[in-house]
């Protein structure tokens, strides 16, 4: 039995994760974490998630929770994820990170600490999105430089980072396939007399509104034709299922940094 703890247990994603763990054979929820000021501390994590009592109380004591845990799942914010990663290194525990918005410096810190323990870091745990990643690479390689690339992503009005980590990863995959530097090719804003589009640009547009779970479309636009690769998330359950699959896969792996492409055998 793989023992799993969830950080951000009282949040929307945390509830989905707890439910998915309960429904997955071979996994056991052994810890549920929230920040020290959370009004949900001391509550049964299963009742909070809406999946019935689990006799696991929500706590803010990360070190104590990790003592009884094999894998920690963290969908929070980069600063929190880094602190939790450091704790996992201290306790020699594995971690699945679904947080997005890491700076280059923060990402370098993740890379460094992943030399000590198994780490899954993925901007999107959805199987469908990761299939799209593979399709984007193949499409870019086939189409080459003759098609302009634009990316549009939509999310709910509570999302804090922009563009989404998934959209950035899509841009990176396309740029790599075309032999470009994503950081030099990405264009996040166009306004006024900004001049004609250059062939190297990868445009990135963001929409925020309502309760959109997540939608990403990559446009390959040529002369007289257009290809669109779109993924639409209907609920957060698919992200939770992917994260739980990652936790199951990660148990017993060698130290290193992995992503969903490793887990799905797409590399």
Swiss-Prot record:
(S)-2,3,4,5-tetrahydrodipicolinate binds at residues 156, 165-166. The keyword Repeat does not apply. It is an enzyme of class 1 (oxidoreductase). Keywords: Amino-acid biosynthesis, Cytoplasm, Diaminopimelate biosynthesis, Lysine biosynthesis, NAD, NADP, Oxidoreductase. The keyword Oxidoreductase applies. The active site is at 155 (proton donor/acceptor), 159 (proton donor). GO terms for biological process: diaminopimelate biosynthetic process; lysine biosynthetic process via diaminopimelate. Its main location: cytoplasm. Pathway: Amino-acid biosynthesis; L-lysine biosynthesis via DAP pathway; (S)-tetrahydrodipicolinate from L-aspartate: step 4/4. Gene3D superfamilies: Dihydrodipicolinate Reductase, domain 2 (3.30.360.10), NAD(P)-binding Rossmann-like Domain (3.40.50.720). It catalyses: (S)-2,3,4,5-tetrahydrodipicolinate + NAD(+) + H2O = (2S,4S)-4-hydroxy-2,3,4,5-tetrahydrodipicolinate + NADH + H(+); (S)-2,3,4,5-tetrahydrodipicolinate + NADP(+) + H2O = (2S,4S)-4-hydroxy-2,3,4,5-tetrahydrodipicolinate + NADPH + H(+). GO terms for molecular function: 4-hydroxy-tetrahydrodipicolinate reductase; NAD binding; NADP binding; oxidoreductase activity, acting on CH or CH2 groups, NAD or NADP as acceptor. Its EC number is 1.17.1.8. NAD(+) binds at residues 8-13, 34, 98-100, 122-125. Pfam families: DapB_C, DapB_N. GO terms for cellular component: cytosol. InterPro entries: DapB_C, DapB_N, DapB_N_CS, DHDPR_bac, NAD(P)-bd_dom_sf. Catalyzes the conversion of 4-hydroxy-tetrahydrodipicolinate (HTPA) to tetrahydrodipicolinate. Belongs to the DapB family. This is 4-hydroxy-tetrahydrodipicolinate reductase. It comes from Syntrophotalea carbinolica (strain DSM 2380 / NBRC 103641 / GraBd1) (Pelobacter carbinolicus). The gene is dapB.
């Amino acid at each position: 039995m793989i023992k799993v703890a969830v950080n951000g247990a009282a949040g929307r994603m945390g509830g989905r994760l707890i439910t998915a763990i309960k429904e997955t054979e071979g996994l056991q929820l052994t810890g549920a974490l929230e920040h020290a000021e959370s009004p949900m501390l001391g509550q049964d994590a299963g009742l909070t998630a809406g999946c019935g009592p689990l006799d696991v109380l929500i706590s803010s004591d990360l070190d104590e929770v990790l003592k009884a845990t094999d894998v920690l799942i963290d969908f929070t914010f980069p600063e929190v994820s880094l602190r939790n990663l450091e704790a996992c290194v201290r306790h020699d525990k594995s971690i699945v990170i679904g947080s997005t918005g890491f700076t280059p410096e923060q990402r370098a810190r993740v890379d460094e600490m992943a030399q000590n323990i198994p780490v899954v870091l993925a901007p999107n745990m959805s199987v469908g999105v990761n299939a799209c990643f593979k399709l984007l690479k193949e499409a870019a390689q086939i189409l080459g430089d003759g098609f302009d690339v634009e990316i549009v992503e939509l999310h709910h009005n509570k999302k804090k980072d922009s563009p989404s980590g998934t959209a950035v990863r899509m841009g990176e995959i396309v740029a790599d396939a075309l032999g470009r530097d994503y950081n030099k090719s990405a264009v996040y804003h166009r306004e006024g007399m900004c001049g004609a589009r250059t062939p190297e640009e990868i445009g990135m547009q963001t929409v925020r509104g309502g309760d959109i779970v997540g939608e990403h479309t990559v446009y390959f636009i040529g002369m007289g034709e257009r290809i669109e690769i779109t993924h639409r998330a209907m609920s957060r359950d698919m992200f939770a299922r992917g994260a739980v699959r990652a936790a199951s896969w990660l148990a017993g792996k060698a130290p290193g940094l992995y992503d969903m492409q490793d887990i799905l055998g797409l590399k």
